[in-house]
Structure formats: structure tokens, C-alpha cells
């Protein structure tokens, strides 16, 4: 039966079966649409409804258009049955239990298996199976251990699996469970999700990947659902025909083979014969090794490489652990976030062949390296590199890149649309991407190397780490274990889903891959995913000697995975492993959303769950309160430093009383963050009440504070995501203020992070007014919009309207700002901002009082003044008092200063504040600020007699009391 419909048709279906069925029809309508997976359904050319046989159907349609015909077809019983198997709504959770959300009633449930993936349906029933067994429905709930592992199916029914089955063999088949009513008619059928039973039967801690011995090479692949595995060995990376094909032997889900020493330096791929639920077929998949340690260009083949080979080690590599920058405590860390290509792509002081790659960090005389050295000399400790593993969307071979002639862009108007149009035209074929689209986690990205094939990327990555360590910087890698770039049996960048389909990727209750991260969410609640992540981290620590990890969307990873990884890394010893694991710091994005929210798939690594672990998470509270709004709100929403109440912009923020409350609330959030966002820290709120940090609430009643230890808080106001610090300030502040004022606000924001307890985090370019021409998401905006200029001649403001895709809705706000020449800083502004930023680092590292190690130390020493209902809006007064004769109960940790007072004046006018609690002290301007190039901060005054402070507009001033003063 076929009907012609239009996209605006209204369709009502009336069936002779249960009135509950139309709801199922509607769901199937959406799932069968042509664009089911990655985009919303805005128009549909055809769809199918799955109906039981012999069902009478009436379709009532109305339409406003006679164009764009659509067809409606009623499928055959067999196609209806096969469509059921598209879904995997049942879970084989243990050897003895299958969980399914179905009520059998008086009917029955059967389990089917077909090694050839030949299950079908005819009038005689289900055909094509090798095994058919009856499952017994059990009363009561699922076992407690099953609910703990799979909390999202806690209400499912339990079906008992007979004990005499060869489950190790059955999991290699197409599997289905089917319900029949009391008269034997098919009610429902579905495929199965297998991770539970795979974990129970096949969890494995032995060798995986390639292992080298004097006798040869051994390969090991975990693939318990595969029917056959062989390895294709290639002499050269571009060879189309293998020089050898070796079948692998299986032992309890692990496939292995032994090869000759001559295999070393060759390339290989696995050939895997496996049932794939996405196609419902037995597929032959060609896949890289999940434990690959080397690759050919674009990851076409895995490189058989021994990372312990002396040929791959730069001079002095084995002794690098002895030359690591000193790190007394994690509380001494400060982090600078940088993209490898941004660092040098436009730096003419770097050799042309090294620009945009690993080796640029070895160019000691380049502008970029000299800039990093300035930061290190002022105190910076850690360099966070955006993804450097093998990721998709950038060709490893530079000769394939497309580029734009920038000379054609340089003369365009600051608000021109032409630059973004030209960049967008080639953005998927150029050399730029942030890299949050992982293909293989354990190998350096080839496009950053001089030669992407063979050992070059390994050697050059090691040289980069070594050079940065010698500069004084610890190296942090941005790791993306929460999702994969590709899935399915045939995508060239799919790996894990080819080897054990349906295991590595988290699936929803219908059996489809979860995409809340963006695409292809991974499932670290499954043992071998957890293991792969832990093994990969150890690979980077031991083989590349990196000093820390930042976890992208860490909340989508289970807490146990991160905690166990931290423990495994911490156990590494310099004497036995060549690295000191105790100095390696872990932190990440503890956002709590998607299917994992509120521990939906187990206890996840979210902000609130990580308290007490020593693992850091980004504090978005201090960011939003400082700047205003959020990355998801209106870009003109103002905050503490951008003019809320005190210098409003054109956005409607509500009444004056509303703005006063908003500003007071923002101050509470910031002060909590400055105390390392500790949940038990006591402070006085805007109402004059003594409250804990966990009792300070956000607009949705979520507690602001979540940390138990200072090092669990990463304070920041900017990162690679969203607008740069200078850009967001330029959006939120009133149009009429001067660029001088915006520069002071930029510095004020940095100071609030640099002088807070916890770990400060800065985006590369914060210190030189970096602009992306107001681009809010520059992940694929090319070198043009992401430009960093370490010559300090330009901050990249006004290089055209930012790319349309992510920014067009804001163009009406952006255009007048780019048009106005007064918004663009001069080189003198950039240099002054850099000097002021270096001063902040020098101040932070001038006293351990800015870097307190424990929650108790912060509670004892850190106080906030100018609080309560009578406080002066727009200013924060913080004191940090060390132990001395006046407070003998507090130990002395600073031999130089007994008291530090920091005043953050975000007001557009001078701030005067008398503090009786700070009378009769010997406070003076911090020596760094006495010598500062900023003449304005030198106008700050303290009067000992009254305890009064006077600080200029939009200025952060640090007063110190010397012990010998």
C-alpha cells in the first residue's frame, strides 16, 4: 500500500489492534526516517510503519501542499521481524540472566542464535537459527550486582538462562529474544546488548597489542565475539597486498599469533569476521590495533614499532625524569592551555618546515619559545596541549591540505564576510582542527610531525616533551576518552566498533549508540573499555614521559576509571619505570549531563562525585560569576567585572534591585571559588549569614562548592571553548568604554584566577589580549581566526566576521564592534597586558599563602571582608594571614610575609574601604607592584590608623606585611 503525502501532511493512523499501537508507530516513524542518526528530522521523503500481519489500517491525511510527495508502505511479516532486530532492547547481563523490559504475561519468551546471521520470519515462525531455547521469566527484581552495574535498567524483568549453554560460543552469533502470546503469536522481538556477559566471561588483564622479544613479535587482540581473526602484514605502508596473512588463535576471547623479528618495522591491520548489530550481518572488518603504538599516514595501517628502541629516543631521553621541573606540591601548579598548531603556524621566527608542529617547541630562539620562557620565569609550571593523539578531520599528509591566500584577506574590512567564507570553503581540507575527534588514542597525531609515516611522529613528540621540560614546563595532554570519531563496520576511521561491535560504545535502551558528547559515546563502565583507558594513560606516561592529563567531558567517564588510573599512575617509580608517577596531575571537565547524569550509568566522574579524590575539575561557577551569564546564555549578560549594575550595557538585566542581588550573588560565588570552591569553607554571604560553600547556591539550587581539597578546583575564566577573554569582555562591556578600560578588565579577570586558592588555568593569549574576531567556537576556523602573535604587534581583533555556522546569530552584535576602530588594541596595550600578567604570576609564587595545600589551611588563613548587606558592590577584599605570635594556633609557612591583603576593585570608580579588622598592620604595596610598569596600581593606599584602603578603578592591588617590617 502506498500513499502520497507532503512534508506538511497531518497523518492519523487507526488500527484494528490495540489502541496502544499508534504510539509505537510514531516512534518508528522517527527512527526510520532517512536522517535518524545525526540530524533532526525537518523533512522526510519516506518512512515505514511496522504492523503485525493481517492488520487493517486506515490513514487519514490532511495537507497544505501538493508538492514533495512521500510514500507510506506496510512491510511484510519478515521485514517487520528483521526491523525488530535493528533494536537491541534486551541485555544479557550475566551468564544466567537476560534483562528485558517486557511483560510476557501468559505467553512465552525464547532465545535464538544464528552463527550465519540468518534469522528470519515466515508463516511457520522464526527460521534460520542454530539454537532455540525457552527463557523462564523470574519474579522479583534484577540481582543487586546487576542493578549496580546497569542502574538504568533497574526496573527490567529478569529472564533465566539455562546453565548448560556454551555462552562463549553463542556470543559470536546473531542473537535475539522473542515473546509470543499464549496462542503462539509473535508479540515482540529484539536483539541483545552483550557487555554484561562479556565482562563476566572475558575480562582480561594479560598482554594486548604488539610485544617484542629477542625471538620475535607477538600480537594479541581482545575480540570475544569474533568468529575469525587474521593479521595482514605489509612491508611498506602503501602496499595494497600483504606480504603475509596469518590466522590468529583464540583463547578465551583473546586472539594471538607469533611473528618473526623481521616483522619489526612492518605495518599491519587485523581482518575480523564478526556479527555487527548495526547491519545485522556477518561482516569482514579491517581494523587497526586498538593498542597501536605507531601508524602510517592517516592511520591506514598500524606500525609495528618497539617504543623501547634506542633509535626512537632523543639524546638524554632515558634520564629525563631527573631533569623534570621541580614540583613541590600539586597546589603549586598553574596551567597554560595551548593548541600545537596555534603556537607556531604564524611564527616567522620558526623554521618553515617546523611551523605548526611538534618541533616548533624545540626552536629555542623563536618568539613563541621565548614567550613561554617569560611565563616560566615568572612562575608558570604546566603547559596543557590540546589533543595530540591521532584524530580525524585533518589529513596527516600536508601536501593534501588546501589553504587560503591570506594576502587576499589582509586588506578586507574588519567586519567583512569574505574571510569567513573563504576559510569555511576549505575548512575540512586544511591543516586545522582542535582534535576532539579521536581515532586512536595511543599514537601521536601525524599531521604535527615532519613525516606522518613510521617513527618520525614518535621521535618528534618526545623531542617536544623534552624541550618543554628543559624550558621549565611540565607537559599536560588533553585526552578524549569519552567518545570516538567513527563507528560501524566499514568507516575507515572506525576501530573499536569493528573489533567488538556493541561493546566499546555506550548504547541507549533501543540499542543505538549514545551521542550526548557529540557522537559515539564510549562506555567506561565496561571492564575492557576501562582497561583500555588506563593502559593508554600509562602508555603516555611511561613512553612519552608526560606530566599530567586533562580529561575532555570527564563526567561521561566513570569515576572508578579515573580514580584507578590515578592510582596506577601514582604507583610508577623513577627507579623501575623511568618516571615518577606521584607528580602526575589529573583534572578534567566534570560536567554532569546526558545519559550519565546523576549516576545514570554508574558513579560518574562529575564535579560532586570527585570530592576527596584529589582529581581536579573545572570550576565554571567562578567563570560565570566573573564574566556574567554562561556560554549558553545571552552574550551581553554582564557579571562582576563586566559592568553588572555599575556600568550596564544595552541588555535588559531587570530592575536595579534585581541587579543588586545578581551582583551580590556573583560575589558569593567568586569568593567561594577564591577559597578553592571548598564545600566546607565558611564565609559570610551577602545577607550577613555564615554559610558553608556548599550552602551557597546557584540559580537552580545546585551548590556552588563541591571540592574537598584545594587541588580539586581548577579556577578559570577562559579556555579554548567559547570566546577568548578579551572577546567576551568586548561583548559584555558597554560599547562606549575605551580599549584602555577593557584591557584593565582583562587584567582584573586574570588576577582573580591567579590569586585564588586552587589551581589557576589560563587560555593561551589571555596575557596578550588574544582575539578570534569574536568567534565563539573556533575548532575548525583555521589559522586565520585562531592566530597567536608572539611578536605582540596584533591581537587578531577585526579579521572579519567569524564563521557563519556557529556565529551568524550573533553577527548583529559582533558587526558594530568590529566596525569600531576604538575596540582594537595597539601593540602597547598588548605589551602592557603581558607585563601585568607576568606580575600576577610573580606575586602568586612570591608566597606559599597563595597556594595553600589543605582545606584546613584555607579555613584558618583566608578571610573575606566587605561582606554582608552593607558591603560596597563590585569589590572583593581578601586577606590571607599566616601564623605569627598573634595567632600561635596557626603554623607559619611563609618566612617573608605574615599577612597578605588582596583587593579586587571591579568598579568603574575608585574604591575606598575602612576595615577595623585590618587596623594597625604594617601593610605595604607588594614589591612586584612597586616595580610594576602599571602606574595606576601604584596609586593604591593603605592607612594603618584607620585600616582604610583606597584602590583605583578596575585594579587589583596586593598589600603585604613583611615579618621583618
Swiss-Prot record:
GO terms for cellular component: chloroplast; chloroplast stroma. Keywords: Carbohydrate metabolism, Chloroplast, Glycosidase, Hydrolase, Plastid, Starch biosynthesis, Transit peptide. Disruption phenotype: No effect on the starch level in leaves and slight increase of water-soluble polysaccharides. No alteration of the amylase-to-amylopectin ratio. ISA3 is able to fully compensate for the loss of PU1. GO terms for biological process: starch biosynthetic process; starch catabolic process. The active site is at residues 552, 589. The keyword Repeat does not apply. The record marks 721 as: Transition state stabilizer. One of its GO terms (molecular function) is pullulanase activity. Its EC number is 3.2.1.142. Its main location: plastid. Pfam families: CBM_48, Pullul_strch_C, Pullulanase_N2. It is an enzyme of class 3 (hydrolase). CDD domains: AmyAc_Pullulanase_LD-like, E_set_Pullulanase. Gene3D superfamilies: Glycosidases, Golgi alpha-mannosidase II, Immunoglobulins, Rab geranylgeranyltransferase alpha-subunit, insert domain. Pathway: Glycan biosynthesis; starch biosynthesis; Glycan degradation; starch degradation. Residues 1-62 form a transit peptide. It catalyses: Hydrolysis of (1->6)-alpha-D-glucosidic linkages in alpha- and beta-limit dextrins of amylopectin and glycogen, and in amylopectin and pullulan. InterPro entries: Glyco_hydro_13_N (IPR004193), Glyco_hydro_b (IPR013780), Glycoside_hydrolase_SF (IPR017853), Ig-like_fold (IPR013783), Ig_E-set (IPR014756), Pullul_strch (IPR011839), Pullul_strch_C (IPR024561), Pullulanase_N2 (IPR040671). Involved in starch degradation and also probably in the trimming of pre-amylopectin chains during starch synthesis. Double mutant shows that PU1 and ISA3 have redundant function for starch degradation. The involvement of PU1 in amylopectin synthesis is inferred from the phenotype of double mutant in PU1 and ISA2. Belongs to the glycosyl hydrolase 13 family. This is Pullulanase 1, chloroplastic. It comes from Arabidopsis thaliana (Mouse-ear cress).
